[in-house]
Amino acid sequence: MFEAGLPVTTVIADRPCAALSLARAHGAVDELLDRKGYGGFGPAFDRQGYTATVTATLVAHQVDLVAMAGFGTVLGETVHSAFPARILNTHPALLPAFPGWHGVRDALEAGVEKTGCTVHLATLEMDAGPILAQEVVPVLAGDTEETLHERIKVAERALYPATIAWALGELEAGRSIYPPAPPGAQPR
């Protein structure tokens, strides 16, 4: 996102990762809100408490749009109420096909000729939100989960920043991201 020139102000991670040091290097706020302090990734996870902390952090930093990438947590109602139709997510498949944690593997196992990436609005249900943009990636003979996922990531690295830029433009013009305003619509 930084390479695309997008105005990234805050980066939150649910586990230690390179995104935090990248944020720091670009002058953005970096916050590690590690799930370990909320029960980890198992059945003891306190989704409500974790979501409240994420929401408070986003609000404190006056975030306008939330763009999740590699964030391994489905957030609860609190954040969706605070940022209605302003939480984007990306998925390595052409939703609604192959939702969930293993979209690339599932596409390969299904024997499809094409898959791709999707940018959608995040909702309380994983990978079920309204689709905003998609990019098709062909499945090649001999593809493995890793080779296919790398090609999907290339498409995603172009599609996601472009969709975020569009969404920011809509918000700046006073329009909602979803449902999208019809062409020529005036700001509300």
PLM ranges: what are they?
Residues 1-188:
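One-carbon transfer enzymes
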